[in-house]
């Protein structure tokens, strides 16, 4: 989930595996085997009537008897929702805790720090402090098992999505495919485990913050560019990762540009790194690409008023922004222990987004405490506090909880500033936008791209 750059008081514009390290292991479904064929197939001769040559050298052949031919095992066809032996089902419904019964989940891509922080990689003191902190408090920020579990859920859900989503599916089908898989694999448990924020399925010129509301009729087409942005949280530790899907090769260079820009941001990230320098490097990579569409060449532009962000427990936007263009602020830096969502957006349009269309994304503002006079707004806020607290939510999630006739109450909470609305963000009509995003942890000893997979 992205964060738009705050609008200036007087805006000039309209309103507003590069380190060579292995990817984490991912559990792959293993097909169960069929039982051996019936006895009447045993000892069957070859087509020309001869016994298979290998049997002439068997112990059975020495006494003149014919060796029974070893039967080929036929793969058992897996039924919908059935797990392979030791693997994930299709659709994914096997909790990752069942696939990793020892409770140790794969780490992400780990990279050594460079420059003056390179000592951290080999520092026995840093390693010991990291180890002790994780042992002393399983819920501490230094214990990475919860977020690695969330990352494994993300990888397994998105693998199925990438294999299954096809033109002709509705946006609601796609969003619910992601969410149903996430709930099952994470073993949803109130605020302790569940969805990190509404599933973004933004299309084409819409870059972010679109998820279908009830009654949405939009259907995916073969020429669409689909951004899938979803989160998984365990104990408030959120994995935020996104990818882009297309169904022809027309926009391959756009996706390549954005993927490369995100990896540049990850490469440049580190303890004491200036956020402005990271933004400049991202922009340089992004805008070195061009896309030819129907004979017209488009320069890929970074969407300058969208950024990445740090992540705090139960807060998807922690207060620090990772720009994707150069800026003059040299004071903001990354620090040891930070969790960041490094995300970039590229566009064939003007590289600037504005609010566009019906809102679906919302989040409670923890810093606002105002009296509420509307009784229905009070009961709605109670629901929000109980089920989401400061985690983002959408109207479909309220519908799922049985809330009804709440639109006026929700508007009241937004007008009071108690709830923040996050409407869809779009570039100009007719252009295409793409997104890639990973969650990284700046550990004391190394940088870990916790959401890295074998796909991106």
Curated annotation (Swiss-Prot):
It is found in: Cytoplasm. GO terms for cellular component: cytoplasm. InterPro entries: Creatinase/aminopeptidase-like (IPR036005), Met_Aminopeptidase_Type2 (IPR050247), Pept_M24 (IPR000994), Pept_M24_MAP (IPR001714), Pept_M24A_MAP2 (IPR002468), WH-like_DNA-bd_sf (IPR036388), WH_DNA-bd_sf (IPR036390). Residues 1-11 have a biased composition (Pro residues). A divalent metal cation 1 binds at residues 229, 240, 437. Its EC number is 3.4.11.18. This is Methionine aminopeptidase 2. Belongs to the peptidase M24A family. Methionine aminopeptidase eukaryotic type 2 subfamily. Residues 66-79 have a biased composition (Basic residues). It catalyses: Release of N-terminal amino acids, preferentially methionine, from peptides and arylamides. Binds 2 divalent metal cations per subunit. Has a high-affinity and a low affinity metal-binding site. The true nature of the physiological cofactor is under debate. The enzyme is active with cobalt, zinc, manganese or divalent iron ions. Most likely, methionine aminopeptidases function as mononuclear Fe(2+)-metalloproteases under physiological conditions, and the catalytically relevant metal-binding site has been assigned to the histidine-containing high-affinity site. PANTHER family: METHIONINE AMINOPEPTIDASE 2. The keyword Signal does not apply.
């Amino acid at each position: 989930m992205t964060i738009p750059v705050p609008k200036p008081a007087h805006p000039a514009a309209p309103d507003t595996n590069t380190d060579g390290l292995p990817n984490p292991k991912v559990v792959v479904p293993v097909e169960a085997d069929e039982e051996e064929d019936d006895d009447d197939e045993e000892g069957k001769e070859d087509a020309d009537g001869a016994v298979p040559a290998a049997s002439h050298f068997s112990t059975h052949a020495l006494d003149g008897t014919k060796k029974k031919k070893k039967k080929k095992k036929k793969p058992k066809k897996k039924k919908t929702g059935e797990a392979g032996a030791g693997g994930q089902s299709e659709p994914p419904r096997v909790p990752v805790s069942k696939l990793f019964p020892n409770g140790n989940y794969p780490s992400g891509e780990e990279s050594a720090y460079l420059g003056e922080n390179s000592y951290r990689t080999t520092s026995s003191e840093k390693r010991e402090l990291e180890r002790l902190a994780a042992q002393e408090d399983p819920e501490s920020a230094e214990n990475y098992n919860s977020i690695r579990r969330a990352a494994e859920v993300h990888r397994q859900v998105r693998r199925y999505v990438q294999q299954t989503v096809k033109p002709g599916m509705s946006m609601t089908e796609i969003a619910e495919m992601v969410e149903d898989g996430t709930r099952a694999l994470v073993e949803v448990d109130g605020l302790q485990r569940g969805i990190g924020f509404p599933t973004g399925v933004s299309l084409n010129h819409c870059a972010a913050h679109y998820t279908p509301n009830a009654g949405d009729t939009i259907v995916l087409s073969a020429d669409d560019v689909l951004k899938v942005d979803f989160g998984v949280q365990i104990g408030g530790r959120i994995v935020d990762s996104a990818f882009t899907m297309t169904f022809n090769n027309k926009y391959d260079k756009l996706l390549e540009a954005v993927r490369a820009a995100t990896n540049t941001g990850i490469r440049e990230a580190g303890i004491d790194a200036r956020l402005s320098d990271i933004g400049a490097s991202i922009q340089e990579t992004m805008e070195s690409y061009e896309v030819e569409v129907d004979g017209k060449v488009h320069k890929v532009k970074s969407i300058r008023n969208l950024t990445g962000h740090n992540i705090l427990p139960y807060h998807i936007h922690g207060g620090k922004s990772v720009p994707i263009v150069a800026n003059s602020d040299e004071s903001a830096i990354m620090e040891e222990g930070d969790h960041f969502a490094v995300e970039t957006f590229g566009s064939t349009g003007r590289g600037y987004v504005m609010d566009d269309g019906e809102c679906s994304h919302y989040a409670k503002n923890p810093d606002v405490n105002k009296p509420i006079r509307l009784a229905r707004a009070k009961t709605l806020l109670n629901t929000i506090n109980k089920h989401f607290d400061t985690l983002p939510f959408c109207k479909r999630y309220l519908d799922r909880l049985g809330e009804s006739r709440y639109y006026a109450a929700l508007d009241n909470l937004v007008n009071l500033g108690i709830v923040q609305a996050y409407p869809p963000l779009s570039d100009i009509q007719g252009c295409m936008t793409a997104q890639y995003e990973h969650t990284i942890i700046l550990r004391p000893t190394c940088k870990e791209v916790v959401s890295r997979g074998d796909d991106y």
